[in-house]
Regions:
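Auxiliary Fe-S-binding modules of radical SAM enzymes
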Residues: 1-91, 98, 248-257, 264-350
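Residue-level structural signal for beta-strand termini and adjacent loop
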Residues: 96-97, 172
Length: 350
């Protein structure tokens, strides 16, 4: 029996070529592409503008892979966490984060993660595989629908801060963003999309060379090499000096401000010297620092810093002319906060 190919892996041109090679008109490819990405149908039978014979031919050759929300949880603060079942049975998680003025989708790019950051629940999961472009797109599509249903407004922002390191799935993430921003997809502005990376220098430079239009955030957490290596072991492979050079290249090419994600922990990075190192690291380009409240994970050894440590960071950063925000996490009661994804449900199925 012929293995059916996921039709959503084909470009519009490949669809047009398929129809031509099967004795049909190329414009059928345009129609199918619209059904798949704008209208989001799950079956060929639903493509009602196509002749029945064409729909049957498609069903013979292709499948339409779609994600399924296995479990949806709602937090006391309105945050929604989705346990998402992929076509091969694997699970990832995505989150809808509401505020008074906007709704943000936090989406995953990999099943698990291979970077082993010691403070992150996802790092405890073995990386199984990269997500496909349609699987990333579908997470956003589902959360847009949830935003409209629960909050009466379309999705306003997307952050790649879920499970996985987006730059280790570079091509698929960029293909997904292309679909998300295309008028033939969701039509979202790339300026409303932020890709958060732990910092892979050569791929940050590649993004700059590829002239991407979305925003960049770096999961930094310490600007002292030995401290960062202790909490993010891959820093030994991609040291801060190389990361800084890559970010300088990014800014030179894009002129876009760089955002740093930064959790402050008790006894790890809560001293004045830590703030001074961060200021020195940031000064080469316009920067914004998001100070993030730590969210404990099961059996974790990390502790929240004293509020005075956050005040010290905020005061010193602002005095140095660096924009700073203190981000209080949402969805903690359902393990949907930063660093908590995959803390319970996915691990239980390993």
């Amino acid at each position: 029996m012929m293995q059916k190919r996921n039709i959503r892996a084909l470009t519009k041109e490949e669809l047009r070529t398929f129809f031509e090679s099967n004795g049909d008109k190329a414009f059928r490819g345009n129609q199918v592409y619209e059904w798949l990405w704008q209208k989001g149908v799950h079956t060929f039978e639903a493509m009602t503008s196509l002749p029945k014979a064409t729909r049957e031919m498609l069903a013979e050759h292709f499948s339409i892979n779609h994600i399924k929300v296995d479990v949806m949880q709602r937090s006391n603060d309105g945050t929604i966490k989705n346990a998402v079942r992929l076509h091969d049975g694997l699970l990832v998680e995505s989150v809808l984060i509401p505020t008074d003025t906007r709704t943000t989708a936090c989406v995953s790019s990999q099943v698990g993660c291979s970077l082993n950051c010691s403070f992150c629940a996802t790092a405890r999961l073995k990386r199984m595989r990269n997500l496909l472009p349609d699987e990333i797109f579908d997470q956003v599509k589902v959360i847009d629908e949830q935003s409209r249903a629960f909050f009466g407004r379309p999705l306003s922002n997307i952050v790649f801060m879920g499970m996985g390191e987006p730059l280790m799935n570079y091509n698929n993430v960029l293909k997904a963003i292309d679909k998300i921003t295309s008028p033939e997809g969701l039509g979202m502005s790339p300026k409303r999309i932020t890709l958060s990376t732990s910092g892979i220098p050569k791929l940050i430079k590649k993004m700059a060379d590829d002239e991407v239009k979305f925003k960049l955030a770096v999961s930094l957490h310490s600007a002292i090499g030995s401290v960062r290596t202790g909490i993010m072991p891959f820093n030994e492979q991609f040291p801060l000096e190389e990361l800084r050079d890559a970010l300088a290249y990014w800014y030179q090419k894009t002129k876009n401000r760089i955002t740093y994600e930064y959790v402050v922990w008790k006894g790890i990075n809560d001293q004045k010297k830590d703030v001074e190192a961060l200021i020195k690291f940031c000064k080469f380009a316009p920067s914004k620092v998001n100070l993030i409240e730590y969210n404990p994970i099961d059996d974790g050894d990390f502790q929240q810093a004293d509020p005075k440590a956050l005040e010290l960071y905020q005061t010193m950063l602002e005095a140095a002319g660096i924009t700073v925000t203190v981000r209080h996490s949402r969805g903690k009661d359902i393990d949907a906060a930063c660093g908590q994804l995959a803390n319970k449900k996915v691990k239980s199925e390993e």
